[in-house]
């Protein structure tokens, strides 16, 4: 059962669902809009060897960032021209990880799904790849996987980037996501790189 605007407000007002910060104007008919935070990660790897710790760079923006498609030609001259022309803080090509401003806490009988806003789909920017599902009992900020597929897109800190759709489960989970021993991204308060290498470590322990 998907929660309506009335349900979302009831769950938030009762404290069963926590969204911090919460903005009443971001409640849609059956969703809640979330905003883009200031923290990002780009990887330094030529090849993603998922058995290993992936080298990455973390950074923050003051105002805006330009996301370019992977094969969009960039050099220092072009980057400086973009920065000057569009008054942006940073220019990146290829995929990058971002995060929501919102810290979300779900009870064991509510799960959620993240979807990018359709307005961004219309400029061929995707803000999640495969990680749109949020298990019941999750606590943390939502990490975003951001890719531009056509032309460069400028994103602004604190703008609405996507939405959460909440669903009520038929029965509560025995152990919520953030209480599971093997949960990799529980209680994340910032953008997090892939921790898939832990899958191999856990397999060895078992």
From Swiss-Prot:
Protein EC: 3.5.4.30
Catalytic activity: dCTP + 2 H2O = dUMP + NH4(+) + diphosphate
Residues at the active site: 145 (proton donor/acceptor)
Pathway connected to this protein: Pyrimidine metabolism; dUMP biosynthesis; dUMP from dCTP: step 1/1
GO molecular function: dCTP deaminase (dUMP-forming) activity; dCTP deaminase activity; nucleotide binding
Sites marked Important for bifunctional activity: 132-133
Top-rank taxon: Archaea
One BP annotation, GO: dUTP biosynthetic process
Pfam families: DCD
Alphabetical UniProt keywords: Hydrolase, Nucleotide metabolism, Nucleotide-binding
SUPFAM superfamilies named in the record: dUTPase-like
Quaternary structure annotation from Swiss-Prot or TrEMBL: Homotrimer.
PANTHER family from the UniProt entry: DCTP DEAMINASE
Functional note: Bifunctional enzyme that catalyzes both the deamination of dCTP to dUTP and the hydrolysis of dUTP to dUMP without releasing the toxic dUTP intermediate.
Family to which the UniProt record says this protein belongs: Belongs to the dCTP deaminase family.
Name assigned to this protein: dCTP deaminase, dUMP-forming
Organism of this sequence: Methanococcus vannielii (strain ATCC 35089 / DSM 1224 / JCM 13029 / OCM 148 / SB)
Gene for this chain: dcd
